[in-house]
Structures are given as C-alpha cells and as structure tokens.
C-alpha cells in the first residue's frame, strides 16, 4: 500500500489497519514456529529436556475414556530409573507385570485389525481371552473417574493389586482353555465384574477385597474346568 493511499485513511482506520497487520505477522510467526521446517528439531529438543511424551487421543476422549492418553504412543525415558524404584518400594515384580499389561495392549491393537475385517468369531479362544483381558486393562485399570471420591485417587498398592487381578484372570483362563474349558463360560464369570469394581475399594479394605476376589476367581475357574460351551 502506497503512502498516498494510507494518508487518505482516518486515524481510526489507520490504527485498525496497523493492528490487523501486526496480528497477521504474529500469526505467521506462530505458524512457522509450530509447522515450519524446523518444527521436528524443536520437538526433539523439547523431548530431550522433559523426556516424557503423553499422546493425547481424541478418539479416547470421544469414548469418554479419561485420562485420554494413548498408551501405545506415549512413553517416558525415565522408565528404567523409575522401574528400579517401583520394584524396590512397591513390589519386586512391578515392572514385570507392567510389561505384561503393555504386551496385551499392543497385541490387542493388532487383533483389532483382524476383528474389523472378519469379526470377533474368527479369533481363536486364546485370542478372545487376550482381547477381554486387554479390555479389562483399559476399562478397569487405565480408566479413572476423577469425580468419584475413591477412584479420583489410586495408591500404588491398589494399582499393583489391580494389575495382579487382571493378569490372574488372563493366565488362569488360558490354563483353563488348555484343559478343555469353553470360552463362553470364562467370559461370563461373575468375578469379572468384581475385578472391575476393585478400583472403588477403600484403601483400608484393599487386602481383604483382593484376597476375596482372588478366591472367587480360583473357585469359579475350578468349577468351569473341563466344561465345554
């Protein structure tokens, strides 16, 4: 714009024009910062400092799964150091059990692609148990209700016991399948609902509820062993 044209504007219009030009320059700089050719370098520099990445997932938020953090894309570079602390101060097999849960979630993601193409019935009994165990991890362990007076806080002890219950269901169900037990009976066990409610257990009742739930799991699987669908 020439100075002659600019001079014809009123003072108010000049101020508005200058303000808009300033905004455009600012937005251009912001766009270049977040989407420019050096954005990858800035991301990597940030990750080297914080060493943690939380992958927020809109699909989880749409399903009302909170916190809506994708467990497959998120990671922490502190895992090795923190793992030693968890094993020493919470339970000696904390990291081992954590790896079992992560493996189930990763395998679930692979099986979901098969289910989308040919349906759940095409999966083997072992894979169906794997899918159900992964669903329990997502809905019973990872999902948290911040508006619930008990579930809004979860101690490391409770998290550990929840892991043991989910893993117990998975491993004992696989053993039962090897002995000829039908898949439908295992999936319909009443104890599964009790495992899902464990996160609402008060801290002073954790040990007793864990023991009772474990006993129910053992008893119900024992009653099903060898029974076909």
Go through each PLM region and give its residues.
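P-loop NTPase catalytic core
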Residues: 1-10, 14-24, 30, 36-37, ...
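C-terminal amphipathic alpha-helical interaction region
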Residues: 180-229
């Amino acid at each position: 714009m020439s100075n002659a044209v600019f001079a014809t504007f009123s003072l108010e219009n000049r101020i508005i024009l200058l303000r808009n030009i300033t905004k455009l320059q600012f937005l251009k700089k912001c766009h270049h910062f977040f989407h420019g050719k050096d954005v990858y370098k800035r991301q990597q520099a940030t990750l080297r400092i914080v060493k943690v990445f939380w992958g927020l997932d809109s699909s989880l938020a749409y399903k009302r799964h909170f916190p809506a953090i994708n467990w497959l894309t998120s990671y922490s570079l502190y895992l090795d150091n923190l793992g030693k602390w968890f094993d020493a101060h919470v339970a000696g097999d904390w990291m081992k059990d954590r790896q079992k849960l992560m493996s189930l979630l990763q395998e679930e993601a692979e099986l979901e692609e098969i289910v989308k193409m040919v349906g759940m019935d095409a999966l083997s009994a072992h894979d169906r148990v794997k899918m159900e165990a992964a669903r329990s991890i997502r809905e019973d362990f990872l999902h948290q209700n911040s508006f619930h007076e008990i579930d809004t806080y979860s101690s490391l002890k409770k998290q550990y016991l929840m892991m043991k219950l989910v893993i117990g269901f998975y491993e004992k169900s696989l053993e039962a399948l090897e002995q000829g037990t039908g898949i439908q009976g295992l999936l319909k066990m009443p104890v599964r609902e009790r495992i899902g409610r464990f996160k609402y257990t008060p801290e002073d009742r954790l040990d007793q509820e864990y023991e009772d739930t474990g006993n129910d799991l053992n008893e119900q699987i024992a009653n099903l062993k060898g029974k076909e669908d």
